Design a protein with these regions (language model features):
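Short, acidic loop-to-helix structural element flanking the phosphoryl-transfer center
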Residues: 7, 83-108, 114-118
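Short beta->alpha linker loops
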Residues: 25, 50-53, 76-77, 90-94, ...
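Helix-loop "lid/cap" segments that line or gate small-molecule binding pockets
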Residues: 33-34, 53-68, 120
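Hydrophobic alpha-helical segments typical of transmembrane helices
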Residues: 29, 46, 57-58, 116
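Substrate-recognition "cap/lid" segment bordering the active-site pocket of phosphatases
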Residues: 107, 113-142
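Short helix-capping segments at alpha-helix termini
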Residues: 36-40, 65-72, 125-129
């Protein structure tokens, strides 16, 4: 090992944008849902405003622009995202090879909910690489 580098005990992967190419798909779904709810916004604006942010940030933004979200918004968005992922989600190019060659312990830590992380990894064939080594914001006290 290179003495100039710190010793590594564990590799922690984020899911969205690191293991699976989901960010653009999710943001496109969100932008389309917001437009349907009467909020004019582009996918690029959604990427800038909400990527990596919580649902609370989305709700606050919509209230701030005078368009509170209907009760059906989030469940419908979740369905749209799942359908889009089923049709188009892919692993990040080369990540399966990286995981196959990695000789260190590794896991996933994500701000996405556990169901979405599992779904994404299963769709892309990456789930067996991680087993139960999945950690999400839901598991951490704020």
């Amino acid at each position: 090992m290179d003495p100039r580098l710190p010793e590594t005990d564990l590799v922690i992967f984020d899911c969205d944008g690191v293991l699976v190419d989901s960010e653009a798909l999710s943001c496109r779904c969100l932008a389309e849902a917001m437009v349907r709810a009467g909020i004019e916004i582009s996918t690029e604006q959604v990427l800038e405003l909400f990527l990596g942010r919580s649902t609370a940030a989305l709700v606050d933004y919509c209230r701030g622009v005078g368009k509170p979200l209907p009760a059906t918004f989030l469940p419908e968005l979740a369905l749209d995202v799942r359908e889009t992922f089923r049709a188009r989600l892919k692993p990040i190019a080369g990540i399966a090879a990286v995981l196959a060659e990695l000789r260190l312990p590794y896991c996933v830590a994500s701000s996405s909910d556990l169901e979405r992380v599992k779904f994404s990894l299963e769709l892309t064939g990456l789930a067996p690489s991680f087993g139960q080594r999945l950690y999400t914001a839901q598991m951490v006290k704020q």
